[in-house]
Amino acid sequence: QEHFLNRTKTKKLFRDVFALGRGKKWNFMHSGMFLDFLAGNQDYECTPWGMPARNIFGWQKPCYLLGEGYAKTFKELMETTDWETYGTGKYEKCANCMAHCGYEPTAANAALTNPLKAMWVALRGVRTTGPMAPEINLDKQRPAQYIFSAEVQKRLSEIHRDEAVAAKQKASTAA
């Protein structure tokens, strides 16, 4: 999180970049509504369950940027993650996040619920001037917990334990 630009700087950066292409000349692999959000024109909340990630440890809680736990199954991920405690304004680590993994799903949902707005953005391009959407209030966010390294060590220990058990079973079967 220390390497993220703050939200205002991110919005300004994207407005400057999009202004070079007059709002619609860039070929990004994201929806127009998400790009409009990056330029500060949409007021979205994070949808952390919208783009789940899986690695060798399992399904990452709540997203791949935080990795604050792992679930063995997708069902476990969805049922045991306290989704309401994550996102900008809810968790200190999420304060400056505008990443695709949480906001692209929100933008996709916005396009489905308001197709005329999505069409307008697609036709005119990303607006690069004028007022920005209001910021999310950060006053009630919970403090950050730094548990990623402990989670990785826990999972590595489980992998090593499982490998040792498998090797022991293989050796006893061969004997």
Model-inferred region functions:
Residues 1-48, 56, 61, 65, ...:
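Radical SAM enzyme [4Fe-4S]-AdoMet core and its adjacent flexible, acidic
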Residues 24, 28, 84, 101-104, ...:
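Short secondary-structure junctions and interdomain/linker hinges
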Residues 48-49, 94:
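Active-site lining segments that contact anionic ligands and/or coordinate catalytic metals
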Residues 110-121:
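Short cysteine/histidine-rich metal-coordination sites, predominantly Zn2+-binding motifs
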Residues 43, 63-111:
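Membrane-interface junctions of multi-pass transporters
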Residues 89-101, 123-155:
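Short Fe-S-cluster ligation motifs
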